[in-house]
């Protein structure tokens, strides 16, 4: 059950119940200050996520989990630099610095994340020849992680997305959640973006067009 009763719900707040899930996207060392693909102020999402997670009975986490020499790494493409875009068989791909390589400390979820009730970790990006931003579907748009079926089997109706980075893995996760039929929210102050070449503004426009709602943690009825 959720961590509060109906009597505690303030006017205008969004109630969290057993049909709600919090998805915590990629709060991993590589994306935090000092990491190989650090998101500016990425560590600031951690206390916000820890606080709001206390109000959710259902929590799913994701973990970027790349092979060495992954197709999304600039180092895998001769003459290419990080943040350049190339065409791959499944579409356009931003090339990244090597990050979140399987089994490395950089791929570990931050030790400061404290969510003991988290029930599932979805690892993504572990197929060498296709990237995966979304917790639901790989970047080819066809290969499912199984998360949508898992959530539906647990009678989840609403998805709340947090984590790193707003304009890539968070946005893609939110749009795929909406596509799968879930009422979907991005909690803005529990996310941070990379903002490469206008990617953050585009992500907000794309998610709004998809029907994803943009809220703050203060909009939730969590004590």
Label every PLM stretch briefly.
Residues 60-63, 183-190:
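Short internal beta-strands
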Residues 1-11:
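N-terminal export signals
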Residues 186-200:
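Short, flexible loop segments at boundaries between secondary-structure elements
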Residues 20-26, 31:
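Short, hydrophobic/glycine-enriched beta-strand segments
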Residues 47-158:
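Active-site alpha/beta core segments
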Residues 213-222:
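Short acidic-hydrophobic, aromatic-tinged amphipathic segments that line or gate anion-handling sites
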Residues 32-41, 134:
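Acidic/histidine-rich helix-loop elements
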Residues 48-52, 170-179:
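Histidine-anchored nucleotide/phosphate-binding helix
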């Amino acid at each position: 059950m959720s961590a509060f009763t109906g009597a505690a719900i303030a006017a205008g707040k969004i109630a969290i119940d057993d049909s709600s899930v919090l998805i915590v996207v990629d709060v991993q060392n590589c994306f935090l200050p000092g990491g190989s693909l650090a998101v500016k102020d990425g560590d600031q999402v951690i206390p916000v996520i820890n606080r709001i997670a206390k109000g959710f009975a259902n929590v799913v986490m994701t973990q970027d989990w790349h092979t060495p020499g992954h197709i999304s790494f600039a180092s895998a493409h001769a003459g290419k630099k990080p943040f350049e875009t190339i065409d791959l068989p499944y579409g356009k791909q931003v090339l990244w610095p090597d990050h979140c390589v399987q089994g490395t400390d950089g791929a570990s979820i931050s030790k400061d994340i404290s969510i003991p009730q988290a029930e599932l970790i979805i690892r993504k990006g572990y197929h060498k020849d296709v990237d995966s931003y979304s917790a639901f579907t790989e970047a080819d748009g066809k290969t499912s992680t199984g998360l949508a079926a898992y959530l539906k089997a647990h009678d989840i109706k609403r998805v709340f997305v947090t984590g790193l980075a707003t304009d890539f893995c968070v946005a893609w996760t939110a749009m795929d959640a909406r596509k799968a039929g879930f009422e979907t929210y991005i909690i803005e102050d529990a996310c941070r973006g990379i903002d490469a070449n206008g990617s953050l503004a585009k992500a907000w426009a794309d998610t709004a067009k998809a029907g994803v709602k943009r809220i703050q943690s203060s909009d939730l009825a969590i004590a």
